[in-house]
Amino acid sequence: METKVLNKMRSDWNDRAKENAQYYVQNATKEWDQREFFRSGEINVANDVLPDMGTICGGQRSPLDLRALEVGCGVGRMTRMLARIFGHVTGVDISEEMIGQAKRNTADLPNVDLVLGDGCTLAGLADSGYDYAFSFIVFQHIPSYEVILSYCREVFRVLRPGSLFKFQVQGGTGMQTNELDTWLGCSFSPERALELARNSGFELEHQAGAGTQYFWLWFRKPGIATP
Protein backbone atom coordinates (compact mmCIF):
# COMPACT_ATOMS: atom_id res chain seq x y z
CA MET A 1 0.00 0.00 0.00
CA GLU A 2 1.05 3.64 -0.52
CA THR A 3 3.03 4.32 2.66
CA LYS A 4 3.73 7.97 1.81
CA VAL A 5 0.03 8.69 1.33
CA LEU A 6 -1.00 6.89 4.52
CA ASN A 7 1.65 8.66 6.60
CA LYS A 8 0.52 12.02 5.20
CA MET A 9 -3.11 11.20 5.95
CA ARG A 10 -2.31 10.33 9.57
CA SER A 11 -0.07 13.36 10.08
CA ASP A 12 -2.51 15.83 8.52
CA TRP A 13 -5.52 14.54 10.45
CA ASN A 14 -3.61 14.54 13.73
CA ASP A 15 -2.67 18.18 13.07
CA ARG A 16 -6.25 19.09 12.17
CA ALA A 17 -7.58 17.39 15.29
CA LYS A 18 -5.15 19.32 17.47
CA GLU A 19 -6.02 22.62 15.80
CA ASN A 20 -9.82 22.34 15.72
CA ALA A 21 -11.22 18.83 15.44
CA GLN A 22 -14.87 19.84 15.33
CA TYR A 23 -14.31 22.25 12.44
CA TYR A 24 -12.35 19.77 10.34
CA VAL A 25 -14.90 17.02 10.99
CA GLN A 26 -17.87 19.22 10.07
CA ASN A 27 -16.76 22.57 8.68
CA ALA A 28 -20.07 24.42 8.76
CA THR A 29 -18.54 26.72 11.38
CA LYS A 30 -15.23 27.16 13.22
CA GLU A 31 -16.97 27.90 16.52
CA TRP A 32 -19.13 24.89 17.29
CA ASP A 33 -21.24 24.69 20.40
CA GLN A 34 -20.65 21.18 21.74
CA ARG A 35 -24.33 20.34 21.86
CA GLU A 36 -24.96 21.63 18.34
CA PHE A 37 -21.95 19.74 17.01
CA PHE A 38 -23.31 16.40 18.17
CA ARG A 39 -26.80 17.44 17.12
CA SER A 40 -25.44 17.78 13.57
CA GLY A 41 -24.35 14.14 13.78
CA GLU A 42 -27.83 13.12 14.91
CA ILE A 43 -29.30 14.92 11.90
CA ASN A 44 -26.90 13.17 9.52
CA VAL A 45 -27.80 9.77 10.96
CA ALA A 46 -31.50 10.59 10.72
CA ASN A 47 -31.11 11.62 7.08
CA ASP A 48 -28.61 9.03 5.86
CA VAL A 49 -28.97 5.92 8.04
CA LEU A 50 -32.55 5.70 9.29
CA PRO A 51 -34.14 5.63 5.80
CA ASP A 52 -32.24 2.38 5.14
CA MET A 53 -33.21 0.60 8.35
CA GLY A 54 -35.69 -1.67 6.59
CA THR A 55 -33.06 -3.09 4.29
CA ILE A 56 -30.39 -3.09 7.02
CA CYS A 57 -32.58 -5.16 9.32
CA GLY A 58 -33.98 -7.32 6.54
CA GLY A 59 -37.50 -6.77 7.82
CA GLN A 60 -36.94 -9.33 10.59
CA ARG A 61 -34.11 -8.29 12.89
CA SER A 62 -34.01 -5.63 15.57
CA PRO A 63 -31.20 -3.07 15.14
CA LEU A 64 -30.38 -3.67 18.79
CA ASP A 65 -29.22 -7.15 17.75
CA LEU A 66 -26.92 -5.77 15.04
CA ARG A 67 -23.28 -4.73 14.98
CA ALA A 68 -22.43 -1.58 13.00
CA LEU A 69 -19.08 -0.30 11.74
CA GLU A 70 -18.27 3.37 11.15
CA VAL A 71 -15.25 3.97 8.91
CA GLY A 72 -13.70 7.33 9.76
CA CYS A 73 -15.45 8.02 13.05
CA GLY A 74 -13.48 11.18 13.83
CA VAL A 75 -14.31 12.45 17.30
CA GLY A 76 -17.54 10.44 17.51
CA ARG A 77 -19.92 13.04 16.07
CA MET A 78 -22.16 10.40 14.47
CA THR A 79 -20.98 7.49 16.59
CA ARG A 80 -23.03 8.62 19.57
CA MET A 81 -26.27 8.53 17.58
CA LEU A 82 -25.40 5.23 15.89
CA ALA A 83 -24.93 3.73 19.36
CA ARG A 84 -28.52 4.66 20.23
CA ILE A 85 -29.75 2.66 17.24
CA PHE A 86 -27.50 -0.40 17.01
CA GLY A 87 -26.59 -2.96 19.63
CA HIS A 88 -22.88 -2.38 19.13
CA VAL A 89 -20.86 0.18 17.18
CA THR A 90 -17.19 0.04 16.24
CA GLY A 91 -15.58 3.27 15.07
CA VAL A 92 -12.29 3.26 13.17
CA ASP A 93 -10.06 6.25 12.42
CA ILE A 94 -6.49 6.80 11.21
CA SER A 95 -5.81 9.67 13.64
CA GLU A 96 -4.67 9.04 17.20
CA GLU A 97 -5.85 12.52 18.13
CA MET A 98 -9.33 11.93 16.72
CA ILE A 99 -9.63 8.54 18.43
CA GLY A 100 -8.49 10.03 21.73
CA GLN A 101 -11.19 12.70 21.58
CA ALA A 102 -13.78 10.15 20.41
CA LYS A 103 -13.04 7.98 23.44
CA ARG A 104 -13.73 10.91 25.74
CA ASN A 105 -16.88 11.81 23.83
CA THR A 106 -18.29 8.27 24.02
CA ALA A 107 -17.05 7.26 27.47
CA ASP A 108 -20.64 6.95 28.69
CA LEU A 109 -21.59 4.47 25.95
CA PRO A 110 -20.75 0.85 26.85
CA ASN A 111 -21.75 -0.45 23.40
CA VAL A 112 -19.06 1.55 21.55
CA ASP A 113 -15.49 0.52 20.88
CA LEU A 114 -12.99 2.65 19.00
CA VAL A 115 -10.05 1.39 16.98
CA LEU A 116 -6.99 3.21 15.68
CA GLY A 117 -6.62 2.07 12.08
CA ASP A 118 -3.77 2.14 9.60
CA GLY A 119 -5.71 4.12 7.00
CA CYS A 120 -6.40 1.34 4.51
CA THR A 121 -7.29 -1.89 6.35
CA LEU A 122 -9.46 -3.04 9.22
CA ALA A 123 -6.76 -5.14 10.83
CA GLY A 124 -7.90 -6.73 14.06
CA LEU A 125 -11.58 -6.83 13.13
CA ALA A 126 -13.00 -10.32 12.66
CA ASP A 127 -14.24 -11.69 9.35
CA SER A 128 -18.03 -11.48 8.95
CA GLY A 129 -18.39 -9.71 12.29
CA TYR A 130 -20.68 -6.82 11.28
CA ASP A 131 -24.20 -6.37 9.94
CA TYR A 132 -23.85 -2.84 8.56
CA ALA A 133 -21.07 -0.41 7.64
CA PHE A 134 -21.27 3.33 7.08
CA SER A 135 -18.95 6.20 6.18
CA PHE A 136 -19.68 9.88 5.59
CA ILE A 137 -17.35 12.79 4.66
CA VAL A 138 -14.35 10.48 4.94
CA PHE A 139 -13.51 8.99 1.55
CA GLN A 140 -13.94 12.43 -0.02
CA HIS A 141 -10.60 13.33 1.63
CA ILE A 142 -8.63 10.25 0.52
CA PRO A 143 -6.42 11.08 -2.49
CA SER A 144 -5.77 7.49 -3.59
CA TYR A 145 -8.18 5.17 -5.38
CA GLU A 146 -6.07 2.22 -4.19
CA VAL A 147 -6.54 3.22 -0.55
CA ILE A 148 -10.31 3.50 -0.99
CA LEU A 149 -10.37 0.14 -2.80
CA SER A 150 -8.42 -1.43 0.07
CA TYR A 151 -10.93 -0.06 2.58
CA CYS A 152 -13.84 -1.43 0.53
CA ARG A 153 -12.25 -4.86 0.32
CA GLU A 154 -11.74 -4.83 4.07
CA VAL A 155 -15.33 -3.78 4.71
CA PHE A 156 -16.40 -6.64 2.46
CA ARG A 157 -14.32 -9.00 4.60
CA VAL A 158 -15.80 -7.91 7.93
CA LEU A 159 -19.44 -7.74 6.81
CA ARG A 160 -21.73 -10.72 7.04
CA PRO A 161 -23.27 -11.98 3.76
CA GLY A 162 -26.22 -9.89 2.65
CA SER A 163 -25.08 -6.83 4.61
CA LEU A 164 -25.03 -3.22 3.41
CA PHE A 165 -22.12 -0.78 3.19
CA LYS A 166 -23.40 2.75 2.62
CA PHE A 167 -20.82 5.46 2.06
CA GLN A 168 -20.21 8.80 0.41
CA VAL A 169 -17.45 9.71 -2.02
CA GLN A 170 -16.50 12.84 -3.92
CA GLY A 171 -18.46 12.91 -7.15
CA GLY A 172 -17.60 16.40 -8.32
CA THR A 173 -15.94 16.73 -11.70
CA GLY A 174 -13.17 18.93 -13.05
CA MET A 175 -11.20 19.09 -9.79
CA GLN A 176 -7.42 18.87 -9.75
CA THR A 177 -6.05 16.61 -7.04
CA ASN A 178 -2.69 15.10 -6.24
CA GLU A 179 -1.66 12.02 -4.29
CA LEU A 180 -0.70 13.98 -1.18
CA ASP A 181 -3.78 16.22 -0.98
CA THR A 182 -5.56 14.83 2.07
CA TRP A 183 -8.36 17.37 1.92
CA LEU A 184 -9.63 17.17 -1.64
CA GLY A 185 -9.64 13.44 -2.41
CA CYS A 186 -10.08 11.55 -5.63
CA SER A 187 -13.37 11.83 -7.50
CA PHE A 188 -15.72 9.09 -8.69
CA SER A 189 -17.93 8.89 -11.73
CA PRO A 190 -20.81 6.38 -11.83
CA GLU A 191 -18.62 4.13 -13.99
CA ARG A 192 -15.75 4.28 -11.53
CA ALA A 193 -18.12 3.57 -8.66
CA LEU A 194 -19.32 0.43 -10.41
CA GLU A 195 -15.71 -0.60 -10.97
CA LEU A 196 -15.01 -0.04 -7.25
CA ALA A 197 -17.91 -2.30 -6.31
CA ARG A 198 -16.85 -5.07 -8.65
CA ASN A 199 -13.18 -4.88 -7.65
CA SER A 200 -14.06 -5.19 -3.96
CA GLY A 201 -16.60 -8.01 -4.30
CA PHE A 202 -19.76 -5.96 -3.72
CA GLU A 203 -22.87 -5.48 -5.78
CA LEU A 204 -23.73 -1.84 -6.47
CA GLU A 205 -27.31 -1.74 -5.26
CA HIS A 206 -28.02 1.97 -5.58
CA GLN A 207 -26.34 5.35 -6.07
CA ALA A 208 -27.39 8.97 -5.65
CA GLY A 209 -25.79 12.37 -6.12
CA ALA A 210 -23.48 11.59 -9.03
CA GLY A 211 -21.56 14.68 -10.12
CA THR A 212 -21.77 16.29 -6.67
CA GLN A 213 -19.66 16.31 -3.53
CA TYR A 214 -22.17 13.97 -1.89
CA PHE A 215 -22.12 10.95 -4.17
CA TRP A 216 -23.73 8.17 -2.13
CA LEU A 217 -23.13 4.50 -2.84
CA TRP A 218 -25.02 1.49 -1.50
CA PHE A 219 -22.78 -1.59 -1.75
CA ARG A 220 -24.31 -4.96 -0.88
CA LYS A 221 -22.28 -8.03 0.05
CA PRO A 222 -23.78 -10.98 -1.88
CA GLY A 223 -25.57 -13.59 0.18
CA ILE A 224 -28.47 -13.81 2.56
CA ALA A 225 -28.50 -11.97 5.86
CA THR A 226 -29.24 -14.38 8.69
CA PRO A 227 -31.13 -13.52 11.89
Residue ranges and their predicted role:
Residues Y132-E146:
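A short SAM/SAH-binding and catalytic strip from SAM-dependent methyltransferases
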Residues L149-P161:
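A short glycine-rich, Lys/Arg-flanked "PGG" loop and its adjoining helix->strand segment in the class I
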Residues A123-A133:
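A short acidic, Gly/Pro-enriched loop at the edge of an enzyme's catalytic core
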Residues M1-L69, V75-F86, T90-L122, Y145-E146, ...:
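Class I (Rossmann-like) S-adenosyl-L-methionine-dependent methyltransferase catalytic domain
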